[in-house]
Amino acid sequence: MTARFVALYETPADPETFDQHYHRIHIPLARRLPGLRRYTVGRDVTAVRGAPYYMLVELEWDTLDELRSAFASPEGRATASDAARLQELATVRSMIFVGRQAM
């Protein structure tokens, strides 16, 4: 069982500015989150319904408690503060879920 944070970004008004900020500032901050096991970024995400997403991000921890602790840490607060800046550049939907392998 793993805990995951997922963010779906809509296409930003200025993709170049968004990409530069995300890759130069946000990724280095998020990589320091305690207990982070995996950080995946997907581009040109095709939606089954509606408009495609610009980018999908998935961060994974071993447990929900570890995810919560990471978000409450100084590194988590710094990452969340920067995420607020990203939300000025692109609309984002985010969620947390606990996953269990089905197969």
Q: What is each model feature region?
A:
Residues 1-103:
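Macromolecular interaction modules
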